[in-house]
Curated annotation (Swiss-Prot):
The keyword Nucleus applies. It comes from the Eukaryota. This is ATR-interacting protein. Residues 138-157 have a biased composition (Basic and acidic residues). It is found in: Nucleus. A motif (EEXXXDL motif) lies at residues 633-640. GO terms for cellular component: nucleus. Keywords: Coiled coil, DNA damage, DNA repair, Nucleus, Phosphoprotein. One of its GO terms (molecular function) is K63-linked polyubiquitin modification-dependent protein binding. GO terms for biological process: DNA damage checkpoint signaling; DNA repair. Phosphorylated by ATR. It comes from Macaca fascicularis. Heterodimer with ATR. The heterodimer binds the RPA complex and is then recruited to single-stranded DNA. Interacts with CEP164 (via N-terminus). Interacts with CINP. Interacts with ATR. Its main location: nucleus.
Length: 655
């Protein structure tokens, strides 16, 4: 009888654990479904706005073509009908009524045409003529000849306008990308844009709108260094001009090429809409790589100068003196940071809109064959010899694209530096990596293996909170692959442990409470994803110190979320409050899963006992009062509240 009772208890416990796991899976599925639905709604809204803008653009284009056609027709009419007009003047003959809509360009017209007028404009326009029934006998033969000529001319113009209209319609994505790239400024708070990168050189006079002070001397000094240090001069003025010419070519190609969706890594990925190829966007990469590489080289020079103790002893200083240009390494870094942030912003737009750029950055084949159009050699030339002092492991993979190497190199440098601009560099690097991982398929995610060697520096206490949120988003994307998920806790610097310590300590004193809640929600959803996908969840499946810290971190996050909901008062009304309640429920399920799998769960709760005792009754009352509370959540709350009483015994023994 006793054995049967034990078996029954074990069977009930097993069923309860399975039901909790099933609830976690269902909760994760619902969360992913909500995210997918929200993303789908945003995509639909964006698609509607895009169609509206496209329609307005077509109407405006048709209006411009109409004005251009009327202007050309009017000029030809004035030349051909000059003799007849001299005999019959409209002023002297009031019976001649000229249509101003058909014979004169309407320069004052600013409104868009209606759909009916737009459809009428797409048909063959009528020749410029007087009102029927009022044409005088004088010059009738000349008018017939002019009518035939005008009819053929306008037919050609209408056909050309029709072709231009279809070309514009098929290249909407290219137009969006060009508009984003030409935005001034590219980043709020910055004065730089793509125009500055296309117009910058050491030959431009300093102080001009497109030439910031000190950039010319910095570029000349770097050019002298690279010319003496390498045979090809990766940062020479000729290389900059070549990169700028390629970028101009890329602008033209993106504006003219049709949107192709064949063979890009994003196909079959997690996007609701396939990513356009836009192969012309690849031509921007040499210019982006030039300024990112220039910034990396300046950071290396500054590190060498600090190691030597005196800037005058550094090889950079001597090379710049020999080139006749004096530039302090710190000044060079400060000048180039703004250009680097602008280049990273351009790269982010390219990764968001061009499948060809995503394919090239993640390709393991030579850039010469992937880039095409003769720009692959330039891409390689910019990177050869520039990664000699990169952090260990960053530049080891020879199969990486050179620009991806530089991006990781710059990410490692900016993680260890301080300052507002360096924080912007770190944030922009992570934004590029997040978009790159988001726009690629699961088959290409193993190419992000190299990122794990740099991420420990990004999760340090010195990292600002926006950068930490982006790092967690990147980890959540990489955790979708079975090969990458175990590596979150497989290095000497455990990424999960660093993340837990950052959350419990809250080192960023400038960040707002809303930003901290966003980070905590991202972490909870990351742990929920890991707990559902892995047969031995990473949160409890190793002997790492993160097994202890995860209990503390989840308890602290649960306490903060509960305080936020309690301060709001009443049921959740806003989307932010509903997300907080959803995150609180997921945190409860995570804690319950830990209590079932971690034999030392009670001991691990001792350090946060006061918060655990305070939060569990309030959380239990809050969740049980929700209309959609589930049986698994009630069972989890029962177990956690029972564990609360068990925690008191070790506490008393310690006392």
């Amino acid at each position: 009888l006793i054995k049967n009772g034990e078996i029954k208890i074990l069977r009930d416990s097993l069923h309860q654990t399975e039901s909790v796991l099933e609830e976690q899976r269902r909760s994760h599925f619902l969360l992913e479904q909500e995210k997918t639905q929200a993303l789908s709604d945003k995509e639909k809204e964006f698609s509607k706005k895009l169609q509206s803008l496209q329609s307005e653009l077509q109407f405006k284009d048709a209006e411009m073509n109409e004005l251009r056609t009327k202007l050309q027709t009017s000029e030809r009419a004035n030349k051909l009908a000059a003799p007849s007009v001299s005999h019959v003047s409209p002023r002297k003959n009031p019976s001649v009524v000229i249509k101003p809509e058909a014979c004169s360009p309407q320069f004052g017209k600013t409104s868009f045409p209606t759909k009916e007028s737009f459809s009428a404009n797409m048909s063959l326009p009528h020749p410029c003529q007087t009102e029927s029934g009022y044409k005088p006998l004088v010059g009738r033969e000349d008018s017939k000849t002019h009518s035939l000529r005008g009819d053929s001319i306008k037919q050609e113009e209408a056909q050309k306008s029709f072709v231009d209209s279809w070309r514009q319609r098929s290249n909407t994505q290219g137009s969006i990308l060009i508009n984003l790239l030409l935005k001034q400024p590219l980043i709020p708070g910055s004065s730089l844009s793509l125009c500055h990168l296309l117009s910058s050189s050491s030959e431009s006079p300093a102080g001009t709108p497109l030439q910031p002070p000190g950039f010319g001397s910095t570029l000349a000094g770097m050019s002298g260094l690279r010319t003496t240090g390498s045979q090809d001069g990766s940062f020479s003025l000729s290389a900059l001009r070549e990169a700028q010419n390629l970028a101009f070519t890329g602008l033209n190609l993106v504006a003219r090429n049709e949107c192709s969706r064949d063979g890009d890594p994003a196909e079959g990925g997690r996007r609701a809409f396939p990513l356009c190829q836009l192969p012309g966007a690849v031509h921007f990469l040499p210019l982006v790589q030039f300024f990112i590489g220039l910034h990396c080289q300046a950071l290396q020079d500054l590190a060498a100068a600090k190691r030597s103790g005196a800037p005058g002893d550094s090889p950079t200083h001597s090379s710049r003196v020999s080139s006749g240009v004096e530039t302090n390494p710190e000044d060079s870094v400060r000048i180039l940071e703004g250009f680097s942030v602008t280049a990273l912003s351009i790269l982010q737009h390219l990764v968001c809109h061009s499948g060809a750029v995503v394919s090239l950055l993640l390709s393991r084949v030579g850039a010469d064959s992937a880039a095409g159009e003769g720009n692959g050699s330039l891409v390689h030339r910019f990177s050869d010899g520039d990664m000699t002092s990169a952090p260990r492991g960053v530049a080891d993979d020879q199969g990486q694209h050179p620009l991806l190497k530089m991006l990781l190199h710059l990410l490692a440098f900016s993680s260890a530096a301080t300052g507002h601009l360096q924080a912007s560099v770190l944030t922009q690097c992570l934004k590029v990596l997040v978009k790159l991982a988001e726009n690629t398929s699961s088959d290409f995610l193993p190419r992000f293996q190299c990122v794990f060697q740099v991420l420990p520096k990004c999760l340090s206490p010195e990292t600002p909170l926006p950068g930490m949120v982006l790092a967690v988003e990147l980890l959540s994307l990489l955790a979708d692959h079975d090969q990458l998920a175990p590596q979150l806790c497989s290095h000497s610097d455990c990424l999960l442990l660093l993340l837990y310590m950052y959350i419990t300590s809250r080192p960023d004193r400038v960040a707002s409470e809303t930003q901290w809640l966003q980070l905590e929600q991202e972490v909870v959803w990351l742990l929920s994803k890991l707990g559902v996908q892995s047969p031995l969840p990473l949160v409890t499946g190793s002997n790492c110190q993160c097994n202890v810290e995860v209990v503390r971190a989840l308890t602290v996050m649960l306490h903060r979320q509960w305080l936020t909901v309690r301060r709001a008062g009443g049921p959740p009304r806003t989307d932010q409050q509903r997300r907080t309640v959803r995150c609180l429920r997921d945190t409860v399920l995570l804690l319950h899963g830990l209590s079932q799998k971690d034999k030392l769960f009670i001991m691990h709760c001792v350090e946060v006992l006061h918060q655990y005792d305070q939060v569990m009754p309030g959380v239990s009352m809050l969740i049980r009062g929700l209309p959609d509370v589930t049986d698994c959540e009630e069972a989890a709350l029962d177990d956690l509240c029972a564990a609360e009483t068990d925690v008191d015994d070790p506490e008393l023994e310690c006392g």
